[in-house]
Amino acid sequence: MPKIDNGPPDYRNNLPPIVEQNYGKWEYHESPRPGVLKHVGPAGALYSVRCASPRLVCVDFIRDVCALADKYCGGYLRFTSRNNIEFLVSDEQNVEPLIEECEAQGLPVGGTGASISNVVHTQGWVHCHTPATDASGITKAVMDDLFEYFQRDDLPNKLRIAMACCLNMCGAAHVSDIALVGIHRTVPRMDHEAIRKGTEIPSLVACCPTAAIRPDPKNKSVTIVEERCMYCGNCYTMSPGMHIMDAKNDGVAILIGGKVSNARTAPSFSRMVIPFLPNNPPRWPEVTEAVRHIVDLWIANARRGERLGEWVERIGWERFFSLSGIPFTDKHIDDYIFSRETFRTSAAFKY
């Protein structure tokens, strides 16, 4: 077939030789140390050396990483879904020298097994057009505080943290153990002149998920039913005249208990535990302290093998709020039209 520039390349054309030879024949996998995975098959062993990356990187950084791959593993590496770098090493003698050089270049090795892996985050103030908070800044502050857990693998289970700078949540925050979500709290400020000059009114009305935006033919603009607005910012995507960002009222909510894994219990969505924390750059101390508090509570009380959400479900959400000291308010009650599906339907409570 002729080559076409459509979609990703066939992954089979880029596999390391050891992976091709062992494909479908792997015998077992083990973790010799935090940050290193060993995969064994009939044709030999492959070592995955995992180190963290800041996700938003420059060309020079990529060149340095590729130079390490050329030197120690024949140029074979990959980026994980959590923005870690994995060097695919087929020669065991190259593992330790690679780790030493990674550490020397400021690339910490870790994030495997029962640890806190790299934080998935969205664009934030760097690039997103509807952010309620920054993504890179909070990620840096939180992981600086939790860095010791990246290089250990003795936690109750793996812990996944995600950061989304707005409710669009392109950072998979809804299925992470701890999710940091930027939230807007005020309705968009309408610039009617900008709306009239540069907006398709039908598209703007149709984009609102709660039908809060209504056409205003008299003014050739729109109106907003404030009671229906959920502050998602989707309307700003359709019109530059719908200003959603508010430096005073925007902030961060914290959700916990989500997971994608189907092991032990079914996949689950995260649930909100802290409805609002202020934006205090550059280090976001309130957010960092809250995350550290939740992580320490989980480590101290969870059983071996329990994800954060599994631990909370075992002891009950009532007990979690009691242990954590986080106040339970009316903001925790889901008022979405279909939220009844998620409500507890029995009289069994856990205190």
What are the functions of these language-model segments?
Residues 74-81, 112-113, 152-158, 215, ...:
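Flexible, glycine/charged-enriched surface loops at secondary-structure junctions
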Residues 89, 93-101, 313-332, 337:
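Terminal amphipathic helices with adjacent charged low-complexity linkers/tails
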Residues 16-23, 49-199, 350-351:
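Small-residue-enriched alpha-helical segments and adjacent helix-cap loops
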Residues 259-302:
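A hydrophobic, small-residue-rich beta->alpha segment in the mid-to-C-terminal subdomain
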Residues 284, 291, 297-306, 311, ...:
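Long, compositionally biased charged/polar accessory segments in the mid-to-C-terminal portions
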Residues 203-224, 228-253:
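Iron-sulfur cluster-binding cysteine motifs and their immediate structural context
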Residues 9-16, 22-57, 120-124, 270-276:
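Short glycine-/aliphatic-rich beta-strand segments at the starts of folded cytosolic domains
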Residues 119-122, 160-167, 308-321, 341-342:
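A glycine-rich phosphate-binding loop feature that marks nucleotide/adenosyl-phosphate handling sites
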